[in-house]
C-alpha cells in the first residue's frame, strides 16, 4: 500500500512538472503572438487632395508705377532658395487632364480680370451711330525707302476708320460732336445692306451683345511669373520624367512647396514664354484617338517671334460725363503701316520637322499635314495675344501650310502650298481694341490705345493643335492650330504637378503595449453620445456628459473651423469694399487651413493620450483581420504609403478603438485616485464614516458565521459517513487510533493515548478563533506546497538551462577549434602550392633567360660548323 502511494506520488510529480512546463511554453507563445497598435506621428504618407493655393512672386518683376492685372504685388515674396526633395523608390500617378490646379488657376485669372476692370468706365454711351470713313494720311515716303515698307503701307490703308458721333457732355441735356479713330475690326455697319463698300453708318461691334468696359489707364497686361504654393500640411508632387506624357505613373518624383514661375500668357494657337522639354518634342492629349481633344505640343527649342506696330499713335481724352473719361486714338503720325510679326523661317521649319517626327510616331508613320484654321471666332482663326498693351490678331496661314513625309531613303519630303520667299516669315496682324473677354460670355473690354511705337519679342514654346477626323485607312493626318480654352494654356505648365495632403498620423502593430490601470469596464453610453450635438448633452447628468468629452471637443473644433470659413465667405463677398484681391483671400484661406490641419492632428493625439509624442504605444490589441502580415513583412518590406493603402479601410475603426481605450484608461485612473482617501487617516474617526464601519463589521461577522456553519455541516457529513451519530454538539467525539496503537487497560498496561476524546468548542469567541485558525492553517499548507512546487520547477529549469548553455558553449568551442584547424590546414596547403608554383615559374623564367643568353654562343657554334 505504501509502495502504491509512493508510485502515485511520483507520477503526480511528473505530471506537475510536465504540466508546468507546457503552461510556461503556452504563456510564452501567447505573449509573443500578442501585437498592439502603436501610433506614429510624422510618417511620410500623403493622399491626393484639393486645397486653396496661394501665390508667390518676385517683388522686382513688375513696374511699380503701373498696376499689372495679375495683382502680383499682393503675393508673398518668392523663396530665394527653394527646396526640392527627391523621393527615392516612389512611383506616383499623375493626370494633367483632371488636375484641380488648372481649374483653380483658371478661376483666379478670371477673378483678377474682373477685379481689375470693376472700377473702370463703362462705355455704354458710345453705343450710338458712328459716321465713319476710311482713314488716309499723307504719304511722305521718299524714293529711298524700302519697297517692303511701301507694301505694308498699302496693306495698312483701310485698317482704321475716322468716325464722328454725338456724345453727351457733363451737362446731360447738352450734346457735342466728337471724333475718334477705330480699327476696322471694332466697328460694324448698321445699314441694311452690309455688303456694300460705301457704308458710312457704323456702331461698335459688341454693342448689341455685350457690356463694354474700358480698361483702367494704368493697368498693365504684361505677364509676370506666378508661383503657386501649397499651405502647411499640403505639398506639391512634381514629375521629373523627361518624356512624361501627362498621364500615368511617374517614377522620378520630387516634392516642392511652390511651382516654377508660370507666366499667365493669354494666347491662342501658339504658346508663348512657357517651359521647354528637356530632350525631344513632347505631345500630350487626353485621348489621341479622339480628334475632338486638343493636342498640346511642348517644344524643346524655342522659336523667337518679334512683333511690331509701326504707327506712332497719339491718345485723346473724351469726357463722357462727370468723372468718366474715354481714351481713344487721336491721330497717327506718319504713314499707316500694318502691324506684323517676324519669325525665322529656318527655325520654324526645323520645329515643324521635329513636331512631324513625334506625330508620326504617335499616328503610325503617316504623312503629317499642317493646315490653317478651319474657321470660327477671330481669336481662334488667328493667333491672338497681347503685345505691349495692344491685342494683336495675326494670320498664321504661312506657319501651317506644309505636309511632311519620309521617303523610302529616309529623307524628309516637304510639300508647301506657297513657295518660301526670304529667310523671314512675316505674319500680317490686325489690332482690336474691343476684346471679347475669353473668360466671361456677354462681356467685352475696350483696351486703351497705346502711344508711340510698339515692339515686343516672345518665345514660342508650344503649340495647340487639333486633328481632322477621318478613317483609319487614310494616309495623311491633317493638323490645324487651335486654342481658345485657356485651361489648355495653364495645363501646358501645370502638367507635372499634383496637390497632396500630408497624413502625418500612422498606426502599425508592434510588440510594445502601454502600461495602463487594469480595469475591464467599458464606457457606457459612449457610442450613443457620438450622435449628440455639442450642446445636446447639456441636459444630461455630469457623469453622462463627462463620458462624451471627446465628442464635444471635436465638435467644438469643427465649430471654430466652420466659423472661420463663414468669416472667409463674408470677406470674399465684401472684397470689392475691402479692396482685397483674390490672392489676399487665398492667403487667408491658406493660413486657416494650416491652423486647422495642425489643430486636428494635435486634437487626435490629445484624445489618444499621445500629446507631444512621436511614437506612442496603446493598449489596443492588433486584429489580424486588419492585416495578417508579420512584423518582418511590415517593417522591413513595406513603405508607409504601401502600409497606409493596406489598412486604409480600417483606419477609422482603429482610431475609434484608441479613443475608447484612452477614455477607459482615464476613467480607471480617476477611480484609482479616489482610493487616495485611505491615505488620510484623520478622516477615519469622522462620524460620517461610522455607518460604513458598522456595515463592514456586520459583513465580517456574517461571513464568519456562514463559514462556521459550512465547516460544521461538512464535519457532520464526514462523521456520518464514518458511522457516528452526533446527538449533540456537546457529545465527546473519540479520535480514532491506528491499528498498531492498542487501547489502555485498567491495570495501566499499554500506551497512554495521546489522542483522547475531544468535544466541540462552544462560545462565540471560541468558534471564531477555531475557524480562523483552521482557515489560516489550511491556507498556509496549500501556499507552502505551491511554493515548494514552484521552487522545484525553477530549480529544475535553471539546472536544465545551465546544462544546455554549457553544452552549447562546449559545442561552440569544439567547432571553433575545428574551424581554426581547418583554416590553418588550408593556409598551409595554399602556401605549399604557391611555393611550388613559384619555384616552377622561377625555373621556367631562368631557362628562358639562359636561352636568350646562349643565343650568341649558338650562332657562333653554327658558324663554326658551317666553316668546317
Swiss-Prot record:
Q: Point to the regions of Basic and acidic residues compositional bias.
A: 738-755
Q: Which gene encodes it?
A: env
Q: In its UniProt entry, what is this protein called?
A: Envelope glycoprotein gp160
The region called Immunosuppression is annotated at 586-604
| Similarity-based family | Belongs to the HIV-1 env protein family.
Region of interest: V3: 307-340
Q: Where is this region: V2?
A: 163-207
Which residues of this protein are annotated with the site description Cleavage? 522-523
What UniProt keywords are attached to this protein's entry? Answer: AIDS, Apoptosis, Clathrin-mediated endocytosis of virus by host, Cleavage on pair of basic residues, Coiled coil, Disulfide bond, Fusion of virus membrane with host endosomal membrane, Fusion of virus membrane with host membrane, Glycoprotein, Host cell membrane, Host endosome, Host membrane, Host-virus interaction, Lipoprotein, Membrane, Palmitate, Signal, Transmembrane, Transmembrane helix, Viral attachment to host cell, Viral envelope protein, Viral immunoevasion, Viral penetration into host cytoplasm, Virion, Virus endocytosis by host, Virus entry into host cell
Spans annotated as Disordered: 731-755
Q: Which InterPro entries match?
A: Gp120_core_sf, Gp160, GP41-like, HIV1_Gp120
Amino acid at each position: 500500500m505504501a509502495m502504491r502511494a509512493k508510485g502515485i506520488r511520483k507520477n503526480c510529480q511528473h505530471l506537475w512538472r510536465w504540466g508546468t512546463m507546457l503552461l510556461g511554453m503556452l504563456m510564452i507563445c501567447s505573449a509573443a503572438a500578442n501585437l498592439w497598435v502603436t501610433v506614429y506621428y510624422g510618417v511620410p504618407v500623403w493622399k491626393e487632395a484639393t486645397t486653396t493655393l496661394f501665390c508667390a512672386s518676385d517683388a522686382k518683376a513688375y513696374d511699380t508705377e503701373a498696376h499689372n492685372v495679375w495683382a502680383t504685388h499682393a503675393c508673398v515674396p518668392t523663396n530665394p532658395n527653394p527646396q526640392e526633395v527627391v523621393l527615392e523608390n516612389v512611383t506616383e500617378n499623375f493626370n494633367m487632364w483632371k488636375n484641380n490646379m488648372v481649374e483653380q488657376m483658371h478661376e483666379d485669372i478670371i477673378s483678377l480680370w474682373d477685379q481689375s476692370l470693376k472700377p473702370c468706365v463703362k462705355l455704354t454711351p458710345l453705343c450710338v451711330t458712328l459716321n465713319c470713313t476710311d482713314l488716309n494720311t499723307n504719304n511722305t515716303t521718299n524714293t529711298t525707302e524700302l519697297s517692303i515698307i511701301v507694301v505694308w503701307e498699302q496693306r495698312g490703308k483701310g485698317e482704321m476708320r475716322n468716325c464722328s458721333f454725338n456724345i453727351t457732355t457733363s451737362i446731360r441735356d447738352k450734346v457735342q460732336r466728337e471724333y475718334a479713330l477705330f480699327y476696322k475690326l471694332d466697328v460694324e455697319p448698321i445699314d441694311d445692306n452690309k455688303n456694300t463698300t460705301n457704308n458710312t453708318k457704323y456702331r461698335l461691334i459688341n454693342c448689341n451683345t455685350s457690356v463694354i468696359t474700358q480698361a483702367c489707364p494704368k493697368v498693365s497686361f504684361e505677364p509676370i511669373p506666378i508661383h503657386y504654393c501649397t499651405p502647411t500640411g499640403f505639398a506639391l508632387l512634381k514629375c521629373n520624367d523627361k518624356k512624361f506624357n501627362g498621364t500615368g505613373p511617374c517614377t522620378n518624383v520630387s516634392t516642392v512647396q511652390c511651382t516654377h514661375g508660370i507666366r499667365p500668357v493669354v494666347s491662342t494657337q501658339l504658346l508663348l514664354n512657357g517651359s521647354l522639354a528637356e530632350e525631344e518634342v513632347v505631345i500630350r492629349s487626353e485621348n489621341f484617338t479622339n480628334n475632338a481633344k486638343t493636342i498640346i505640343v511642348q517644344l524643346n527649342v524655342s522659336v523667337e517671334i518679334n512683333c511690331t506696330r509701326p504707327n506712332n499713335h497719339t491718345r485723346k481724352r473724351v469726357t463722357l460725363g462727370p468723372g468718366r473719361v474715354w481714351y481713344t486714338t487721336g491721330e497717327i503720325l506718319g504713314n499707316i503701316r500694318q502691324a506684323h510679326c517676324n519669325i525665322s523661317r529656318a527655325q520654324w521649319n526645323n520645329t515643324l520637322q521635329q513636331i512631324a517626327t513625334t506625330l508620326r510616331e504617335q499616328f503610325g508613320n503617316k504623312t503629317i499635314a499642317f493646315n490653317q484654321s478651319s474657321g470660327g471666332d477671330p481669336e481662334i482663326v488667328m493667333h491672338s495675344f497681347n503685345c505691349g498693351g495692344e491685342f494683336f490678331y495675326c494670320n498664321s496661314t504661312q506657319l501651317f501650310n506644309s505636309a511632311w513625309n519620309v521617303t523610302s531613303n529616309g529623307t524628309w519630303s516637304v510639300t508647301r502650298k506657297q513657295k518660301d520667299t526670304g529667310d523671314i516669315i512675316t505674319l500680317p496682324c490686325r489690332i482690336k481694341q474691343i476684346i471679347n473677354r475669353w473668360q466671361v460670355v456677354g462681356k467685352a473690354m475696350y483696351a486703351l490705345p497705346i502711344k508711340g511705337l510698339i515692339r515686343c519679342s516672345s518665345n514660342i514654346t508650344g503649340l495647340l493643335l487639333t486633328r481632322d477626323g477621318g478613317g483609319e485607312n487614310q494616309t495623311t493626318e491633317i493638323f490645324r492650330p487651335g486654342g481658345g480654352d485657356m485651361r489648355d494654356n495653364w495645363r501646358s505648365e501645370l502638367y507635372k504637378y499634383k496637390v497632396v495632403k500630408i497624413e502625418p498620423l500612422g498606426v502599425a502593430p508592434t510588440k510594445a503595449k502601454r502600461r495602463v490601470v487594469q480595469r475591464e469596464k467599458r464606457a457606457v453610453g459612449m457610442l450613443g453620445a457620438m450622435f449628440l450635438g455639442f450642446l445636446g448633452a447639456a441636459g444630461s447628468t455630469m457623469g453622462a456628459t463627462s463620458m462624451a468629452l471627446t465628442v464635444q471637443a471635436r465638435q467644438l473644433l469643427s465649430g471654430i473651423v466652420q466659423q472661420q470659413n463663414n468669416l472667409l465667405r463674408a470677406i470674399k463677398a465684401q472684397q470689392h469694399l475691402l479692396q482685397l484681391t483674390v490672392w489676399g483671400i487665398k492667403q487667408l484661406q491658406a493660413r486657416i487651413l494650416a491652423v486647422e490641419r495642425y489643430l486636428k492632428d494635435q486634437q487626435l493625439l490629445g484624445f489618444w493620450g499621445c500629446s507631444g509624442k512621436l511614437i506612442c504605444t496603446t493598449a489596443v490589441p492588433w486584429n489580424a483581420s486588419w492585416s495578417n502580415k508579420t512584423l518582418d513583412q511590415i517593417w522591413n518590406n513595406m513603405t508607409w504609403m504601401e502600409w497606409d493603402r493596406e489598412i486604409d479601410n480600417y483606419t477609422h475603426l482603429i482610431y475609434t478603438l484608441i479613443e475608447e481605450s484612452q477614455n477607459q484608461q482615464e476613467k480607471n485612473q480617476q477611480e484609482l485616485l479616489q482610493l487616495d482617501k485611505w491615505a488620510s487617516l484623520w478622516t477615519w474617526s469622522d462620524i460620517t464614516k461610522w455607518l460604513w464601519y458598522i456595515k463592514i463589521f456586520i459583513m465580517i461577522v456574517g461571513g464568519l458565521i456562514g463559514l462556521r456553519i459550512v465547516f460544521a455541516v461538512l464535519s457532520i457529513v464526514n462523521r456520518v459517513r464514518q458511522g457516528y451519530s452526533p446527538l449533540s454538539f456537546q457529545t465527546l467525539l473519540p479520535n480514532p487510533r491506528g491499528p498498531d496503537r492498542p487501547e489502555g487497560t485498567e491495570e495501566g498496561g499499554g500506551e497512554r493515548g495521546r489522542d483522547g476524546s475531544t468535544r466541540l468548542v462552544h462560545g462565540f469567541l471560541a468558534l471564531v478563533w477555531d475557524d480562523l485558525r483552521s482557515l489560516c492553517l489550511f491556507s498556509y499548507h496549500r501556499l507552502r506546497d505551491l511554493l515548494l512546487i514552484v521552487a522545484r520547477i525553477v530549480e529544475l529549469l535553471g539546472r536544465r538551462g545551465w546544462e544546455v548553455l554549457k553544452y552549447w558553449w562546449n559545442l561552440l568551442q569544439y567547432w571553433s577549434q575545428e574551424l581554426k584547424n581547418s583554416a590553418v590546414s588550408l593556409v598551409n596547403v595554399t602556401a605549399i602550392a604557391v611555393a611550388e608554383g613559384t619555384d616552377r615559374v622561377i625555373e621556367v623564367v631562368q631557362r628562358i633567360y639562359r636561352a636568350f643568353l646562349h643565343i650568341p654562343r649558338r650562332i657562333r657554334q653554327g658558324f663554326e660548323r658551317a666553316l668546317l
